[in-house]
Amino acid sequence: MDSSAQQLWHNLLERLKLLLTRPAFETWFQTATVKEWQNDRLVIQAANPFILNHLQKNYLSTIAEVVQDIVGYPVEIQLTAQQGDLIAIFQPHTSLESELSPTNQLNPKYNFSRFVVGPTNRMAHAAALAVAELPGREFNPLFLCGGVGLGKTHLMQAIGHYRLELYPQSRVFYVSTEQFTNDLITAIRQDSMESFRNHYRHADILLVDDLQFIEGKEYTQEEFFHTFNTLHEAGKQVVLASDRLPKQIPSLQDRLISRFSMGLVADIQAPDIETRMAILQKKAEYENLRLPREVIEYIAVNYTSNIRELEGALIRATTYISISGLPMTVENIAPVLNPPMAKIATSPEIIMAVVAEKFQLSIADLKGNSRRREISFARQIGMYLMRQHTDLSLPRIGEEFGGKDHTTVIYSCDKINLSQHQDRQLQEILAQLIERINSLSRNQ
């Protein structure tokens, strides 16, 4: 590494020390090195893929801004890990065409081979694969709907990767709704609407993410309507993703609701525990990590909301183990993760019914006074879940369970809360109950 690269790296680190907290700097930058600095391109090497991903998601723009401030002009930034993963992060733009680059947003890790299929995403996966193989035939548009971190973006980009592998010259455009809007604003400002329209309306496959953010943007909706029509009439494939159904997006034009719903709307739900474990196992395999089964079970049981949260927990655990030098055990990672139980909007009737079903008891058993161990245990779990996932007071929960005193409710909640931290079987039971309650509550 020449002296100019060393000097730039030194200056960059000194600036980052001033901008970041000490723990953040030491955790994410202290082990990084500069690998290359030439032809206005800076390549930074992270210690492992987890740090690489964190830098990409959280410090990309900061690095680019600081480097530009140091050298006086925009610089291309690349991140790499010691294992060889490379992600092109930041490329300076000088014209509208460069800002409208069609494929540089695709994450190389978002492909079909790395997507874990389970019962909650099987239809969406099958539809995405069909679209990738024969775009513009069936399911046009394909509308992927689901909560945050459930794999919509992964599937969209997998379509792009698959098509580009078969036909490298395909014009595959992946953009967020925000980027589409920003490109539109730039085109208006630069008086280059013709260039904007030529770009988007000549796509072979248009992948638009986070469509819910089109809400309230009348001019963006107008321009997107005509873009959609042009592509659809030409037999080109459009794939859309949103955290809600078309008709649930506020102030979305009726004509757009109609067009977005004319193909296939594929819903993606939170993964079940078996799928969550498979996701963790596959990620560990790709990252060359050896994870004990009990660690995988612990994370899968305690993180149930979405895949992003699940993988985030794995990253925190492995980063902590890497830094601390401790063995990978549940006991060592539990204090770092400290997973919260996700609160849900539900009713006491649903909780009572789910608990009774799980333990093969009747509602009368739960509300009665039997001290049989299995009934008492189920009753305590029911009280705990009702306390955690409803707004009922302690006396009101006691009434739901046949008029029990509020001190009995307190004892039950405390006992389950303490026991779950040492009992992995109880953790799994609670996770299964919450999944079932979630499912029934969504269908109320």
Curated annotation (Swiss-Prot):
Residues 1-73 are annotated as: Domain I, interacts with DnaA modulators. The keyword DNA-binding applies. GO terms for cellular component: cytoplasm; plasma membrane. It is found in: Cytoplasm. SUPFAM superfamilies: P-loop containing nucleoside triphosphate hydrolases, TrpR-like. One of its GO terms (biological process) is DNA replication initiation. Residues 322-444 are annotated as: Domain IV, binds dsDNA. Keywords: ATP-binding, Cytoplasm, DNA replication, DNA-binding, Lipid-binding, Nucleotide-binding. Gene3D superfamilies: 1.10.1750.10, 1.10.8.60, 3.30.300.180, P-loop containing nucleotide triphosphate hydrolases (3.40.50.300). Residues 73-104 are annotated as: Domain II. PROSITE patterns: DNAA (PS01008). Pfam families: Bac_DnaA, Bac_DnaA_C, DnaA_N. Residues 105-321 are annotated as: Domain III, AAA+ region. It comes from the Bacteria. ATP binds at G149, G151, K152, T153. GO terms for molecular function: ATP binding; ATP hydrolysis activity; DNA replication origin binding; lipid binding. InterPro entries: AAA+_ATPase, Chromosome_initiator_DnaA, Chromosome_initiator_DnaA-like, Chromosome_initiator_DnaA_CS, DnaA_C, DnaA_dom, DnaA_N_dom, DnaA_N_sf. Plays an essential role in the initiation and regulation of chromosomal replication. ATP-DnaA binds to the origin of replication (oriC) to initiate formation of the DNA replication initiation complex once per cell cycle. Binds the DnaA box (a 9 base pair repeat at the origin) and separates the double-stranded (ds)DNA. Forms a right-handed helical filament on oriC DNA; dsDNA binds to the exterior of the filament while single-stranded (ss)DNA is stabiized in the filament's interior. Domain I is involved in oligomerization and binding regulators, domain II is flexibile and of varying length in different bacteria, domain III forms the AAA+ region, while domain IV binds dsDNA. Belongs to the DnaA family. Oligomerizes as a right-handed, spiral filament on DNA at oriC. PANTHER family: CHROMOSOMAL REPLICATION INITIATOR PROTEIN DNAA (PTHR30050:SF2). This is Chromosomal replication initiator protein DnaA. The gene is dnaA.
